Design a protein with these regions (language model features):
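C-terminal motif of bacterial Sec signal peptides marking the signal peptidase cleavage site
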Residues: 41-42
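Extracellular/oxidizing-compartment recognition motifs
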Residues: 47-129, 133-520, 527-528, 544-549, ...
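Alpha-helix capping and inter-helical loop/turn segments
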Residues: 540-541
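Bacterial N-terminal signal peptides that target proteins for export
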Residues: 16-32
Length: 591
C-alpha cells in the first residue's frame, strides 16, 4: 500500500493543477457580461497593503498535507503608485521565529511578483505544523511588507510511519446494519499535539470522547477504491484528556458497498466489500516524546442503530437500538466483539486536502400541511441538496417514513416521477429518497450520516397517528464548502434571479466531485461538468474539487486512452458517450 502517488500520476497532477490555477484568464464570456450591461465584482479586498489569502495546496491552513513539495500560494495587493519587484517566503516550525526575519527551516527570495511557489527545502516531517509568511519589496522602498502568519500541518509522509491495520467486522456485503468501532486507551502525560488520520473504504464518522471530530460530512470523498482512497486528518488535541480516552468510528456503505440497485451497476463494482478502515493517532507530548496508536484487532465492534444506509437512496434508523455513551469513557462494552484485521483494499492512500462537505444552511418549513392523522407534507423555501433533521417523540415502535422529493401531485403528496426512474429496486425495503425511523418512545433525534438527497418537499407518514408541526423537521443544506469569490449583479431582476439559481444548482451538485443531479443519479458526468466549470470558477473557489476529480480521471482512464462518461465509475460508461462532447472534459476542465 502506497502513501504517495507514483511519478506518472504526479506529473499528471502537476499539469492539471497548473492549468486549473491559471483559470483566472478572462474568456469571451466575460465580454458577454459587459454586453448585457452587468457588472462582475471580485471579492478581493483591494484596500489591503499586505499579502493576503495565503494557501497551501489551494486550502487555507490545511491539516494532513502529504507531499514533500507543497504548493504555497498568495495574493499581492494592487499598489497605485509603486510596483512589487521581489517576494520573500519564510517558513519555520516555530511561529515566534517568523515575528522577525528569522527562519529555522526555509526561506526563499524571488525576483518579480510571483503568486505561488512549491516548497523545495529540506524534507518535511510527518505530523508537524509549519508556519509561513510572505513579504514583498517595491521598486521605491527596500522595506519588506509581510503578510500575517499562516500554517499547514503535515499528515503521514511515509508508509514507514503508518502503524494502523485495516480492520472490519465479521459480516459480508449483504449485511445491512452499519457498525460501530471503539478503542479505549490511557493518557498519562500532557499532550502538546494530537493528530488522528483515518482512511476508510466506505464512509466514516469519527468521534473522540463522545465529541465529533471536525464538521465534515460524507468523508472520505468518492474515488475508484481499488486504486485510491483518501485519508482525512483531524487535530484532536482539544478532545483528549488525562486518564481514559475513547476513539469511536461509525462506518457507512457510501459507494463502496452499494446495496441499492440502479441502471449503473454500482452494486456490481469490482471493489465492493463490507466497509473497512485504517486509522492512527499521533501523539506529541510536552516532554518532546511521540507515540502512535493504530487500529488493530484489539478494537471492539458491534451494530449501530443505523439499520440500513445507501448513499443513493436513504438511511434507516432504529432509535430503540441506541447505545448511549458508546464512544465515551466508562462505557460498558460487554457483548462487543473484536474487529478483524484485513487486507488493504487499495493501491494508494492520499490525503484529502480539499474543501470538505459541510452543512451550510438550515431551513424551517414554510408550511406543514396535515393530510390526515398520520401523514404530513413539509414545504421548504427552496430546492436543496442535503438531508432533514427530525426531532420527535412518539409511541415506541412507531415507524415514520420521510419521503423527499421535488414535486407534488394534485393531491399535495410528494411525487417521485421525475427522480426515481433509473432506480431498479429488488423489493420494497429500500424506497427511493425515503428515510425510515423507528421511534424509541423517548425524545428522538435523527439526521442521516451516510446519505444526501435533492428535495424541496418531505412527506412524513406514520404507522400510527402522530401530531407533527413545522418544528419537528428542519431541512439541512450541504455541499462541498467552497468559498464564494465572485459577485454578480445587474439592473435586471430576472438576470439576478438566474444568477442566484445558477449558483444554487451548481452547489447542489458539488459533493467532492461535480454531479449532474443530487437525487436521480449523483453521477459525475464529464460533459455536464465541463459546461458548468467556467461559471463555477468565476463564482466559487472550487479548484481543490476539480483537482481531486482530475485524479479520478487518471484512475479511470484505460491503457488505450478511453475514458468513461461518468467519473468515478464501477463498470458503466466506457462504451457510451466517448466522443469529444464528453471526453473533452479531460482537456477543458484543466484549461
Amino acid at each position: 500500500m502506497k502513501y504517495q502517488q507514483n511519478s506518472k500520476r504526479e506529473e499528471k497532477s502537476k499539469f492539471i493543477t497548473n492549468q486549473l490555477t491559471n483559470m483566472a484568464h478572462i474568456s469571451i464570456r466575460s465580454y458577454l457580461y459587459l454586453l448585457l450591461g452587468t457588472t462582475l465584482f471580485s471579492c478581493a479586498p483591494q484596500e489591503l497593503k499586505t499579502p493576503f489569502e495565503l494557501k497551501c495546496e489551494n486550502i487555507p491552513v490545511p491539516v494532513g498535507v502529504d507531499t514533500q513539495t507543497p504548493r504555497l500560494s498568495w495574493k499581492l495587493p494592487l499598489l497605485e503608485e509603486d510596483s512589487i519587484n521581489r517576494v520573500e517566503i519564510w517558513l519555520s516550525t516555530d511561529s515566534t521565529q517568523l515575528s522577525g526575519r528569522q527562519s529555522g527551516y526555509w526561506n526563499k527570495s524571488i525576483i518579480g511578483a510571483p503568486i505561488r511557489v512549491s516548497y523545495d527545502g529540506q524534507p518535511l516531517d510527518s505530523y508537524t505544523t509549519y508556519y509561513w509568511k510572505i513579504g514583498y519589496q517595491t521598486s521605491s522602498k527596500q522595506k519588506t511588507t509581510f503578510s500575517p502568519i499562516s500554517s499547514f500541518t503535515t499528515g503521514c509522509l511515509s508508509s514507514d510511519n503508518w502503524k494502523g491495520k485495516w480492520i472490519t467486522d465479521k459480516h459480508d456485503i449483504t449485511y445491512r446494519p452499519a457498525p460501530y468501532y471503539r478503542k479505549s486507551f490511557q493518557l498519562d502525560k500532557t499532550i502538546e499535539q494530537a493528530l488522528l488520520t483515518i482512511a476508510s473504504a466506505g464512509l466514516h464518522e469519527l468521534s473522540v470522547n463522545g465529541q465529533r471530530a471536525g464538521n465534515h460530512f460524507l468523508d472520505p470523498m468518492y474515488t475508484h477504491f481499488n486504486k485510491r482512497i483518501l485519508s482525512v486528518t483531524h487535530d484532536v488535541t482539544s478532545l483528549l484528556s488525562m486518564g481514559e480516552n475513547v476513539i469511536g468510528v461509525q462506518l457507512g456503505n457510501g459507494w463502496y458497498n452499494h446495496q441499492s440497485t440502479a441502471v449503473w451497476f454500482f452494486d456490481k463494482a469490482s471493489w465492493r466489500n463490507r466497509p473497512k478502515f485504517t486509522a492512527q493517532l499521533h501523539l506529541r507530548y510536552t516532554d518532546g516524546t511521540t507515540e502512535y496508536l493504530g487500529t488493530d484487532s484489539a478494537w471492539q465492534t458491534t451494530d449501530s442503530p443505523v439499520i440500513f444506509n445507501s448513499i443513493y437512496t436513504a438511511e434507516h434508523y432504529d432509535a430503540q437500538k441506541e447505545l448511549a455513551g458508546w464512544d465515551s469513557p466508562g462505557f460498558n462494552a460487554t457483548g462487543w466483539y473484536h474487529a478483524q484485521e484485513t487486507e488493504s483494499p487499495t493501491e494508494t492512500i492520499k490525503s484529502q486536502v480539499m474543501h470538505p462537505i459541510r452543512e451550510t444552511a438550515r431551513y424551517t418549513a414554510t408550511q406543514c400541511k396535515k393530510i390526515n392523522d398520520s401523514c404530513y407534507v413539509y414545504h421548504f423555501p427552496k430546492n436543496i441538496a442535503g438531508v432533514t433533521e427530525l426531532k420527535v417523540k412518539g409511541k415506541k415502535g412507531t415507524k415514520l417514513r420521510l419521503k423527499h422529493g421535488e414535486l407534488l401531485d394534485k393531491n399535495g403528496i410528494v411525487n417521485m416521477a421525475n427522480i426515481d426512474y433509473h432506480y431498479r429496486p429488488t423489493d420494497d425495503s429500500d424506497p427511493f429518497q425515503t428515510d425510515i425511523v423507528i421511534l424509541s418512545g423517548k425524545q428522538d433525534r435523527f439526521m442521516p450520516k451516510f446519505n444526501y438527497k435533492g428535495f424541496q418537499f418531505v412527506e412524513v407518514s406514520s404507522s400510527a397517528p402522530i401530531q407533527l408541526s413545522d418544528e419537528n423537521l428542519i431541512a439541512v443544506e450541504m455541499h462541498s464548502d467552497v468559498p464564494a469569490i465572485g459577485y454578480w449583479s445587474s439592473s435586471s431582476d430576472l438576470l439576478n434571479k438566474i444568477w442566484k439559481a445558477t449558483n444554487s444548482s451548481y452547489l447542489a451538485n458539488l459533493f467532492g466531485y461535480p454531479t449532474d443531479c443530487p437525487q436521480r443519479e449523483k453521477n459525475g458526468w464529464t460533459g455536464d461538468a465541463h459546461i458548468a466549470i467556467e461559471t463555477g470558477l468565476y463564482n466559487f473557489d472550487g479548484i481543490s474539487i476539480y483537482e481531486k476529480w482530475m485524479n479520478d480521471f487518471c484512475d479511470e482512464q484505460k491503457d488505450n486512452g478511453i475514458l468513461p462518461c461518468i467519473i468515478p465509475t464501477s463498470v458503466w460508461g466506457y462504451d457510451w458517450a466517448n466522443g469529444v462532447d464528453w471526453t473533452s472534459a479531460v482537456a477543458i476542465i484543466p484549461w
